[in-house]
Structures are given as C-alpha cells and as structure tokens.
Swiss-Prot record:
This is Nicotinamide riboside transporter PnuC. Residues 43-48, 90-109, 178-183 are periplasmic. The gene is pnuC. The chain crosses the membrane at residues 22-42, 49-68, 72-89, 110-127, 158-177, 184-206. InterPro entries: NMN_transpt_PnuC. Induction: Repressed by NadR. It comes from Salmonella typhimurium (strain LT2 / SGSC1412 / ATCC 700720). The lineage of its organism: Bacteria, Pseudomonadati, Pseudomonadota, Gammaproteobacteria, Enterobacterales. It is found in: Cell inner membrane.
Length: 239
C-alpha cells in the first residue's frame, strides 16, 4: 500500500475509545516533528530539514482527510522553515552565526503581545468563516492545478477560543524561532499544554501523549535558550 496513504496503518494504539490507528505517514511526520523541535532547542540548523519533512507529510495528510484550511497553513510553515534555515545559516565575517539567541526588546514584546491578543480575539469570533474562506482558496488552487477535489462539508469549531490560540500562537512562535527569540519557546509551551488538554477532551489520547512529549521538549528548550541569552547579556523585557 502507498506509504503516503493514511490507510496504510503502522500500528493500532489501544488507548481511548476504540483506540487509534497510526498510519506510516503520520508516524514518520510525527517523528520528524519531534526531531525538529528537539534539534531547535539545541540551536541546530538541521532542525529545519526535519521541519520541512514534518509540514510536507502533514500537508499530504490534511489533503487526504480534506482539512484544506490546515493544508494551506502548512504552506506558511513550509516557507517559514525555508526562511529559518536561511536566517540561521547566515554568518558574520568571522564565520560566526549572525543571529544570536536573545530576548525580545520590551517595545517588540509589547507589539507582539498586542498582535496576539487582537488576532486571537478576531479568530475566536470569526474562526468558522475564516476557515471556510481558507478552504475555498485551497480548493480553488488545487482545482487550477488539475486535482479532482470538491468543497468539503465544514463543521462548526468545537473549541473556537482554544483553536484560535493554538493557530495564532503557532504562527507567532514560528516567526520568533526563525529570529532566535527566547519567547518562541514560552509560546510553544503554552500551545502544547493547550493541545494536550484539547486532544484529551476529544478522546484522542495518542495525540495528547505526543503533545505532552512536545511540552517537555519545549520546557527544556526554554531553559537552554534562557541560559544562552543570559550568557550573551540579553535580559527579558529590556529596553
């Protein structure tokens, strides 16, 4: 059976109601995601290779299960991984990494906070129509490319506020990571904790366990990057 098919099951995980069928593509994509976050916590540029594998495979998964809005968001994360790889690779004349781990200056931190609050508020109010528009855009693009896809039936979001938080904070965290700002890890901790709870409430315990592992990696990443920023003389909320 095709490796890229979500019906090619690697293992049945006997947890939750009815268990969870883990496909090969999801397993490889998940492992790539875990490696990406772990290597990023160690400030290794190679994290972006695994990040690209992760978003590519999950884009394929989202295509198969008709989550076209989520597929479209993977294009952003793909581009962000490409940019992050480039930004982290840049060197000074002394062959040192041009970007250093540091905290956001207070004005930038406040600006990002305002952006997050406003974006989460708007998304919470309009998440269903926003995802409907994103889905229509994705379907139109795929149809122009010759793919035989139709507009899926969309269900109202069960957790509009929390899903909005995860989407907005994930985008902001990815942007901050490409610029090596410590705050990206604090956001990932928040995102992962929310994900653990949401998936547990939905009975998808395998995904909840995955995000629990990601939470521990993000907490360790926060510790490592805070120490690294301190060694370079960078302080949180400094002007």
């Amino acid at each position: 059976m095709d490796f890229f098919s979500t019906h090619n099951i690697l293992i049945h995980i006997p947890i939750g109601a009815g268990g969870y069928d883990l496909s090969w593509i999801e397993a490889v994509g998940t492992i790539a995601g875990l490696l990406c976050i772990w290597l990023a916590s160690l400030e290794k540029i190679s994290n972006y290779f695994f990040g690209l594998v992760n978003v590519t495979l999950f884009a394929i998964i989202f295509f198969q299960i008709q989550l076209y809005a989520s597929l479209l968001l993977q294009l952003f994360f793909f581009a962000a991984n490409i940019y992050g790889w480039y930004a982290w690779s840049r060197q000074t004349k002394d062959n040192q990494a041009e970007l250093k781990i540091r905290w956001l200056p207070l004005p930038k931190a406040m600006a990002w906070l305002a952006i997050c609050v406003i974006a989460i508020g708007l998304m919470t109010r309009y998440i269903d129509p926003v995802f409907a528009v994103l889905t229509r855009v994705a379907v139109a693009i795929m149809q122009m490319l010759g793919l035989q896809v139709t507009m899926p039936v969309l269900q109202p979001d069960a957790f509009p506020f929390w899903d909005s938080c995860m989407m907005v904070l994930s985008i902001v965290a990815m942007i901050l990571m490409t610029r090596k700002y410590v705050e990206n890890w604090l956001l990932w901790v928040i995102i992962n904790v929310i994900s653990v709870v949401i998936f547990a409430l939905q009975g998808v315990y395998a995904m909840s366990l995955e995000y629990l592992i990601l939470t521990f990696i993000a907490v360790n990443g926060s510790r490592l990057w805070i120490n690294s920023a301190r060694e370079r003389g960078s302080r949180a909320l400094s002007r």
